Amino acid sequence: MSPIDAYLHTVIMEAATEARRQGSATIEAQHLLLAVAAQEGTAPQRVLASAGLDYQAVLAALDREFDHSLSAVGVSRAAFNLPRPSMPSKRPPDIGATGKLALERAFASAPRKKDLRPAHVLLGILQAEVGTVPRALALAGVDRADLLNRVRDAIAGDGVE
C-alpha cells in the first residue's frame, strides 16, 4: 500500500469513527476534517495547528456551528436535555455528499495520483465554499483564504509526504 493510500485509509476510518460518534449515518466533510486534525505529525495536521486548529479546536468550532445553525431557526441546544447521539449501526457509515465532494476536490487538485499528498485531502475539504466546514471556520475566526494558501504552500514544499 502506498503512503497516500495508507493515509487515505486511516483518515477515512477515523472519519467513520467520528461520524458514528456523532450519530451520523454518513461520513461528511466535517468528519474528514476532524480525522485530518487527529493525524499527529502529518503535514495537514501541522498546517491546521499553525492556524490554531488542533483536534479540540476543530471539534469546538463544529459545535459552535451546530449551535449557531440551531439558533438561526430559534432553537437552543441548552434549552433541551438532549441525549447523546446513538451509534447508527455496526455497519460502517457510507461517504456522504460533502465527504465525496471533498475527496473529489482532493483528487482533482493533484495532476496524477502519484502526485497526491495528504495535504491535498485537507485542500479538498477546505475548498468548499458552502456547508458546515466553511461556516465552522468562519465562526471560529479562521481566515479560510490564508489557511488555503498555507495548505498550497505545504503541497508546493512537500516533495515526499
Q: Residue locations for each model-derived region?
A:
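Histone-fold recognition with a strong bias for associated Lys/Arg-rich disordered tails
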Residues: 1-161
